[in-house]
Amino acid sequence: MINIRRMWQPLTATPFLATAAHHEILPCESLQGWIRCFWGGIAGAGASPTRIIPDVCADLIYHIDETAGRIIQASFCGVSDVCGTAHLPLIPGHTVSTFAIRFHAFGAYAFADDALRGTLNGFESPEVRFGRLDRALRARLLELDGLTARAAYAQSVLLAFQCRENPLVETAADVLLCHRGTATISEWAHELFISSRQLERLLGEYWGMTPKKGSALVRYQALYQEICRGTLNNVQDAVARYDFADQAHLCREFRRYHGENVSRFFKTSCENGRTMEENGVYPPEEAST
């Protein structure tokens, strides 16, 4: 069922954005069950803050002073369950770039040296849990020029990596995505032939979150994706499809994670007429091979 994980493409707050400051590159097919994308760009003077929404992903981020030839900041940002803004570090008179790997929430553990427990909404040095990967990336990041070259190198490192694979964790992701986050915790555990308590421990260690939180974030993202793609036409359809108790319940959950009224977002999406088919998130040439 790895195809379910490969097909799962969570979206950011600006899914159609592709500029010099922010661009995304898909990984090769072999990594798509674990890696959402490589992303980065050049921060221009007066760059505005970036809006952040829960995308059910974790990021390994490097900010690079291209002028001085040094990494000025590196961090691992765990899965987030809040919306907000992020600011890029800027140095007057210097060119600053960003390079990052965006892991699926259920894929980061495969490249980590330690458990991801406690990383929800976390911000820490890559050395804490990704020491081996961090050292391999730092070895060549500075000598490579541009996002495409850095993404290609990072991809080669990840492909050669001795991953920590756990079939039960991967099956848990398949079940979660198959139900779009709507299954109860007991139903989820039953499909895995384990207890709810075992599921709680499993996800805490490998995903850094509880089953309840994982379900809520996937349900929000699946709903958000459908609105962006234009496959949901109104709030009433969304309530039924995603098993919300009523419209008020859906509105509360959407506002909690998106910071916006869902009815207004439906209207804005329809007025913009922006669908995934018309505005693909990734230019075709930016899919890695």
Predicted regions and their residues:
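Alpha-helical bundle regulatory/interaction domains
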Residues: 1-173, 177-180, 184-186, 192-196, ...
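Long, low-complexity intrinsically disordered regions
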Residues: 186-189, 200-205, 212-215
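Residue-level "edge-of-site" marker
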Residues: 202, 217, 252, 268
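A secondary-structure capping/hinge motif
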Residues: 205-209, 253-263
